[in-house]
């Protein structure tokens, strides 16, 4: 949609059809892509977020569902700007063909940066603040357009319109040039988000085609400023619609001793060295440390030039084959339409009715963001780079995928996918299992990027995803091997030596490890491994070792058993025993043993009062804060605790409040990093009226839906039913409390569903009112 009118949807752009269901609720036959606004979350701004993490960090460019390629504008290189784009920036430095979505820790990818220019050749992008000039261009915000599978903008410095679209393995750029004798397409082959590729190669194959590669190692920064251990090579096969009659290279001689990390590659000495690089025009191929390529040509007013690119992480032959199979014979309009069709098909896994246009846009954009990762990592022929850095070929049982942001996505993203796309969950698990196998590490990584064991964040989140999948009937992988690797993971990273994990970050580590061990216990019990189940259930109780009865709360503990000093603001002091949170937020993370947690905390009434205080002190803008901090993951289960405390109306109240205040149809519409689908998946589930409270069991909490009707299309390979529907009668912004419920036409008085009831298909009807019904859903859970 046009950003200038992002809150407006043109009614005539789709057909409204109505059909009365048996429950008397109108069904809308809408087109999901009409409600996707890729600008939501597309900001890294620290100022707008009020915290170093920034906002959503999503990208607005074109991609396909779970595609390998993302063709997106980039406005900044260096720093912690993982998407390469931030809406408040006034200039664009180019259009990359790979991007990460919604993450921190410097990010990575952003490779193969293409920029159309005119006039004198510039070899550096320059700086966003204008202090150093280069080929970057200002752009007209009013012309910036983004839809599912399409992006366009006008570069005002060059008077060039740029449009992008994508197939799963390829991207396409269409440039509309002005009349100019020196028009140009130039490519920065060294560019990489959060750093640089460390070596590159380019070869001119014929009058229209180039191919090559860009090698990215930790020495060039990237993921975690190099600490994330990302080590990959991007291969490309690029074809231009105009002949390469006047082309050239530039190659900067970077001294071996120079540091090439995010800050250094945008420093004045580094940029000076690149700007002084000689132009080379007498060769067909070149390899170097910092290469660029350009092709120049005259253009007429309004002349369109296309550039198509195939991408592979395997080899140059793979990039060429991806190109030939997916995009060689297609023009821009065809690629754009096919991308839109792919998105409509995937987004139709959930159908909604009711809500405002803005709420529909938040919903379908959220669903869109959950369908970026885990992305495909195989070429069209099934080949991929494995955990041993060798070429493998998938056997047809699964699709190899990459980007597993475990600490984030086990909470909502994978439970959502277990409902609407269980094959994706199976793919992700098979990908983690094969990586552990091929690398010979035989344990699960908590944050995987392109086969890297990055060690990012904490806990053992893959154990949660595995247990949750198994308990929900997703078992299309080597179960015994998967289980053994789970046991190995717990042994390598856990609370075994002391019964807790000592400082630093002892609260977070201990509680997260305890939950993961409970997940292994669930698996062991289901597999008939009774001794293992008993042992891991006991390990799941390790959270108790971090609770200081004198203080009445979880407290950091040292290796010698002593407690860390208790400051005056112990509960709300960020990093006091906790990662990216405080003890007041992290301390609620005992999802696998809520009764035990409540007992430690002084009983149900005490806990309800404490939870109420947590929410009452939360700022209305929901930005980063010391209380209910929805901008980060540790609290994402907390609103659903009220269901288990026999006050489900508080779950209903606060989830509706969060949906309204933490999400919006605007750039700043995600209050924290989107985190590879997690923030979006939370909204989709909560706004639909259900959400897990403890992945690894099959309980799904019922809450107050934003929408009048939500239909989840199920997968017949994994589920017995075809559709599970949630209907909210008499639903509006005031009537947010559930008065009664029917499940498949029969009275239902539980505030939760079992996943089997969802998988069987059927209908949950909720009857809403403006006051809490303090009798519905009260089952003395504790």
Where are these regions (language model features)?
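C-terminal motif of bacterial Sec signal peptides marking the signal peptidase cleavage site
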Residues: 18-19
